[in-house]
Regions:
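N-terminal glycine-rich FAD/FM-binding segment characteristic of electron-transfer flavoproteins
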Residues: 1-325
Length: 325
């Protein structure tokens, strides 16, 4: 059954987030040969439309307004619903991001649509789109179908591979005007944090800690190195269970799946559940006192040593490189 599917693209720090392309790929599956329409909301987003098309969208609709320069649920909901009424899609796809998790339930309620959140895989079987998502804190997975109304899903980042980019691919780009008003929230200032504020799913560099960090205080040298490298801090399930850090930092089968350019694993043994969340990193560096630790089997570079001795040395060397670069 061919469907029209509307995909929310997300722009952050002057570029489209990778999850936007993953959402387009998911939408292609849901569409079953139907049309995939990208949607971009913001103050100046039209320049990103072609990139969505290069990754598989058939056409893109943009809504630009200074009132959409920063995300608010009221403003984005107003703009989205105007586009929805014009397009009448049978499917909607968001990334399972802070924006997607906040906005999609509100829209699903307004549209009386069944929302399947945190989707890690999807397929078409027996005429239905079958969504796979984790349950019970990732201890199990369930498969769900939506039998009536609009198919509405949020896609967990780094789980569904984007389509290959085709810069020769063409599609129509149109704009709509929406009178965004009655906003209950006004963004006065955006304050950028250091390592803790970097989105793990988008980070190019991740410094991750396991039980070997020994305490909440033990994460301090990881954060210092992450700040120097402009990266994010992550953690294994073991470190989270031990209450060394928040579960929002968890990487692995039951946490976030990441694919950074550089992944430095500190005091992480390398349980298969953790490897499932980071083994596709471009370069993996392991630091562990145990030379037999499983993490070394997937590492490109290994350092057998005490992370509390190694990390300060790495931090100082990277600081020197930054000064001379």
């Amino acid at each position: 059954m061919a469907r029209k599917v509307l995909v929310m693209g997300e722009v952050r720090d002057g570029s489209l987030r990778n999850v936007s392309f993953e959402a387009v790929a998911a939408a292609k599956t849901i569409a079953e040969g139907g049309e995939v329409v990208g949607l971009l909301l913001g103050e100046s987003v039209a320049s990103f439309a072609k990139e969505l098309i290069h990754y598989g969208a058939d056409r893109v609709v943009t809504v630009e307004s200074d009132k959409l320069s920063s995300y608010t649920s009221d403003g984005y909901a107003q703009a989205f619903l105007v586009v929805y009424e014009e397009e009448k899609p049978e499917g909607i796809v968001f990334g399972h991001t802070a924006l997607g998790k906040d906005l999609s339930p509100k829209l699903a309620a307004k549209l009386n649509a069944g929302l399947v959140s945190d989707v890690t895989a999807l397929e078409v079987a027996g005429g239905n789109v079958v969504f796979t998502r984790p349950i019970y804190s990732g201890k199990a997975f369930e498969k769900k179908i939506v039998t009536d109304g609009v198919l509405f899903a949020t896609i967990r980042p780094n789980n569904i591979a984007p389509l290959e980019k085709d810069e020769a691919r063409e599609g129509d780009v149109s704009s709509m005007t929406v009178d965004v008003k009655d906003l209950r929230t006004v963004i006065k200032e955006v304050v950028r944090k250091t390592a803790e504020g970097v989105d793990l799913s988008e980070a190019k560099v991740i410094i991750a800690g396991g039980r070997g960090v020994k305490s909440e205080e033990g994460f301090k040298p990881l954060k210092e190195l992450a700040d120097v490298l402009g990266g994010a801090v992550g953690a294994s399930r073991g470190a989270c269970d031990a209450e060394y850090c928040d579960y929002s930092l968890q990487i692995g089968q039951t946490g976030k799946v990441v694919t950074p350019d550089l992944y430095i694993a500190c005091g992480i043994s390398g349980a298969i559940q953790h490897l499932a969340g980071m083994s596709n990193s471009k370069i993996i560096v392991a630091i562990n006192k145990d030379p037999e630790a499983n993490i070394f089997k997937v590492a490109d570079y290994g350092i057998v040593g005490d992370l509390f001795e190694v990390l300060p040395l790495l931090t100082e060397e990277f600081k020197k490189l930054k000064v001379h670069s």
